[in-house]
Amino acid sequence: MKKKKIKNPLIRRIPRELLGDWKKYLVVALFLILTIGFVSGMYVANESMLVAANEGVTKYKLEDGHFELDKKADETLLAAIETGTKADVKQYYLDKAKKELDEKLDEKAYPEAYDKAWDKIVEEIDDKYADEEEKYELNDPDFTEVPVKVYENFFRNEEEDYNNDGEAEGNIRVYAKNDNVDLACLLDGAFPEKADEIAIDRMHADNVGVKVGDEISVSGQRFKVVGLIAYVNYATLHEKSTDMMFDAIKFDVAMVTQEGFDSLHKTVHYSYTWNYVDIPADEVEQKAKSDDFMKALLTQVVCADKELEDYMPRYANPAINFATDDMGSDKAMGGVLLDILIVIIAFIFAVTISNTIVKEASTIGTLRASGYTRGELVRHYISMPVIVTLLAACVGNILGYTVFKNVVVGMYYNSYSLPTYQTVWNPDAFFKTTIIPVVLMLAVNLVVIIKMMRHTPLQFLRHDLKKTKRKKAMRLPKWSFLSRFRLRIMFQNVTNYLILFVGIWFIGIMLAMAVGMPETLGYYKSNVSDMMFTNYQYVLKSYENEDGDIITTGNKDAEKFNMTSLQHKSDTLDEEISVYGIEDDSRYVKISDLSALKGNEAYISASYADKYSLSVGDTVVLDEKYENKQYEFEVAGIYDHSQTLAVFLSNEQYCEIFDMDSDAFTGYLSDSEITDIDEDEIATVITEHDITKMCDQLDHSMGSYMTYFQYLCILLSAVLIYLLTKLIIEKNENAISMTKILGYENREIASLYLLSTTIVLVVIDVVSVILGVVIMKAVWRIMLFLQWMVRFSHKHDGLCENVPVYPDRISACHGIGFQKNQAYSDGSGTEKCGITGKI
């Protein structure tokens, strides 16, 4: 007869212990379920949305880039552009110059004068072409032809009146319905079929309260909203690529029929999108192809007597990339948050088990003496935290794929214009929200339990578990009995209070961020006028118009300024610094002795000085981003009335240092609107609205969730306090019994332990606040909240941090000769930030 295997009797203790202390384990489980569930939901939502976005590239025929011309291109030009080859610009200019010369001068009648004029023209064209050839690398030996497919994607910028009150609430960009490129995902209703029907962006509609069936006015013309859509090339509603923040409240994109498009009256923007014939493998190849295609496009456009108004490759388009980049960073943040909270809970479990082992020392000694091995006891005591964590991870993942996923998706849909998605299985979420928490819990508790189990059976039986024995009791102050009792409780539970401190400190920092963000946005909006130099800041495409004349204004408030962007490089961070050229005795940037600056002397902003600990007399070294050039500036003074990281020079100094024409400038500062400069000459206008709309959008997208996050932090703090207070009481069961025997009432006993914990908690809270302030200041100095909040730049894996609108290359298409746009460009084809680029 086969001998029946005897089950390990220790297994029976596990469910009994769970039921016996179910409140504690339930609180821990809920803590883990909420944390794991939310992070799991974040991973699942992220992956599902990113998969939908990646599939949308093909499904909705996303562009590889777009450009805009001043006039509609004919079939010949489009066919030439699609070849990806360069036109012979020099020969084109020679032919055109010869034609104009022939019209003005008869070669046969005045052969000598004709030859002399022609030689001079050739010389000028050679010199000018040589400069532009070097600047734009038109004869780059590594140039490769980039064949593309070009599609028309015209639009009109109209005014939107969504409540039909007769006043425009914002702008709406209207596209005609097409089936070729940059398609839209229909989220509600239907696509327009009639001339008076329109489909608008879903997120904008949610923000302003427009629903399917409502009517809106587009530049005074009524349209019926028949659908809510999400354009694949407008995941975020950036009206301009240089906008500091997308604006889904005062900017909208829409689709109408071709008849509806033709019925509108605003200027048509001749925008063309392209897709590469050979699909790039990654962003590195995208950038290489874009650079080559840009050179070919420039030459073809110039030779067709057209002007290039805008150029934007996909990899640098914030409207396409901002949302997906942000979702990727959320995953990393969620993973770190989960790991930290799991470690805190693991230490709570470790302290609990350590106390349990001390309490059950006699039982453990008996079991060890009866033949149970250390391994069996280690496995028994570690089973509880692992089982609770595993169950919590399973439940949390179930909730993550259902409830919390929808919460995170709702957050994204509240911020971005995203297409429909399908929930996808995410193995990364399972690994990071199930395997890693269990491993962390196992590792922390294993270390503690193995350390405790090193004692001999006799030491367990004698309750002799302390390695160091105090020869005599700690001498306490001559206070009352109850006060000394409370003090001894504090000393006996230092480990528990230390864990409580770490938990409260970490949660306190999160709570400070949750409370601080809305307050900071509110402060920023209410004080933005004090942070701006002027009410209006006009950045021009060039300081000269098409005829070569300097752009001027009759506005008496207007004041010229120069601006460029350099880098402050360090081992840890390359940070952009704005360098301004300001007029002497400026009414807007009031530096009294600016005109007295000589050579490389400069003023720097107080923010710059504070962040990098600079003072008068120090030397600042700044680098060009795309060129191997360095500039040294000697700090001559600190300018206190600027929140930007900036260097201030006189305009004369600026032009000399950056080798510019003496009359060159970037734009105008003005307290009143400038109305006598052609809109086509203006690259961007920065007003208070442009600054505050970013705050409005952030507040709208995240404000309500910050409130939820505050409640979550308070709940986590309450859970930690409950668990550790319960541990302290359990650890002192014998002492509590003795005080009861001595006649103390429950109220008095509670005051001993609860008051002790309360006192420690108050001290912990104060210390946590102080340390939190120190840490937040350190983070502040590194990131400067107001800087990342309003930068123009968008990160694209280090390939291109500034949005490249290429205004200097665009200006190359104005007139017969290439016009050098020194005032606005850094010569690399990358647009400069406006004067408030880093307020």
Language model features: what each stretch is:
Residues 1-39, 382, 386, 468-508, ...:
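N-terminal Sec/SRP start-transfer signal
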